[in-house]
C-alpha cells in the first residue's frame, strides 16, 4: 500500500455536512484495508482566489495509507459531489502523523486565548475580594 496526502475543499454552505462526508470518504479508504494516519478538519478559511465567486471554503486534510484503487474511487466520489470545490491527492514517501503547521498554529491560538481569558478573570476575582474586604471594614 502507498501513502497519500489528500486535501479537499467543500462549499461553505455545506459545512454542516462535512463530518458525514469525512466519514464516507474514510470508509472508502479503510474498506480496502487502508489506514488513516492523520485527519484534520481546518474549518472555513479564506481562499487565495475566488472559486465560482466564493471567497471561503471548508478545508479537510487527510494522510492515509491505502491502495491505488481506493484512491481512484475517492477521486471519482470527489468529482461527482457538487459540494467538493477542489481536491488534491499527492503521493508521499512515508506516513505523516504529526500535526500540520495549520493545526499547530490553531492549537497555539487556542491555548493563548484560554490563558488570556483566565488572566482577566483572576484579576476580577482579586478586585472583588479586595472590595469585599474594604466594605467589611
Curated annotation (Swiss-Prot):
One Gene Ontology biological process: translation
Family the entry assigns: Belongs to the bacterial ribosomal protein bS6 family.
Originating species: Shewanella piezotolerans (strain WP3 / JCM 13877)
Biased composition (Basic and acidic residues): 104-137
Region annotated Disordered, chain positions: 96-137
Domain of life the protein comes from: Bacteria
Function of the molecule: Binds together with bS18 to 16S ribosomal RNA.
InterPro entries linked: Ribosomal_bS6, Ribosomal_bS6_sf, Ribosomal_S6_plastid/chlpt, Transl_elong_EF1B/ribsomal_bS6
CDD domains for the chain: bS6
A GO CC term attached to the entry: cytosolic small ribosomal subunit
GO molecular function: small ribosomal subunit rRNA binding; structural constituent of ribosome
Keywords for this protein: Ribonucleoprotein, Ribosomal protein, RNA-binding, rRNA-binding
A Pfam family matched in the record: Ribosomal_S6
Name of the protein in its database record: Small ribosomal subunit protein bS6
Amino acid at each position: 500500500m502507498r501513502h497519500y496526502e489528500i486535501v479537499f475543499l467543500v462549499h461553505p454552505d455545506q459545512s454542516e455536512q462535512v463530518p458525514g462526508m469525512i466519514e464516507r470518504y474514510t470508509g472508502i479508504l479503510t474498506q480496502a484495508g487502508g489506514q488513516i494516519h492523520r485527519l484534520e478538519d481546518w474549518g472555513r478559511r479564506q481562499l487565495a482566489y475566488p472559486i465560482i465567486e466564493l471567497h471561503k471554503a471548508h478545508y479537510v486534510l487527510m494522510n492515509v495509507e491505502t491502495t491505488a484503487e481506493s484512491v481512484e474511487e475517492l477521486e471519482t466520489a470527489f468529482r461527482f459531489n457538487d459540494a467538493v470545490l477542489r481536491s488534491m491527492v499527492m503521493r508521499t514517501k512515508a506516513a505523516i502523523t504529526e500535526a500540520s503547521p495549520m493545526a499547530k498554529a490553531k492549537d497555539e491560538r487556542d491555548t493563548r486565548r484560554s490563558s488570556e481569558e483566565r488572566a482577566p478573570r483572576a484579576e476580577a476575582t482579586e478586585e472583588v475580594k479586595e472590595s469585599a474586604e474594604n466594605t467589611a471594614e
